[in-house]
Amino acid sequence: MYESLLKHTAEYQKISASLATPGPAALFGLPPAGRALLYAALQKDLGRVLCIVTPGEAEATHFADDLKALGLTAAVFPPRDFMLRPVEGAGREYEYRRLSVLGALAGGRLNAICVPAEALLQYTVPRAEFQKNLSLIHI
């Protein structure tokens, strides 16, 4: 219901036209729920994967949850957890989550990825290299 109302506004048409070409875009002035609704409508219209940059991981998680509620498949790409000194035991949960999100993204299973700015600034493996090292298991 809200999406159909939104799609008939002049502002939506301008934003949709600007996103039809490659490159970044920024949106300011809407509350988070309004941005999520707008991004979900744009993704459904344009069929492109959204990369939404947020200030932190909490905001990325909330945004991904909002997008999931609007019918998109979304994931949070967490920042890498650095250990600056030796520790007895270190969990690898964040690395596993990062690899899982990269795999879903490379496999075309995501409509949107929510990325904290910290994670966006960290290096990751190039797509071709990542796909070369994947193993597909059929069950």
Residue ranges of model-derived segments:
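ASCE RecA-like P-loop NTPase motor cores
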Residues: 1-138
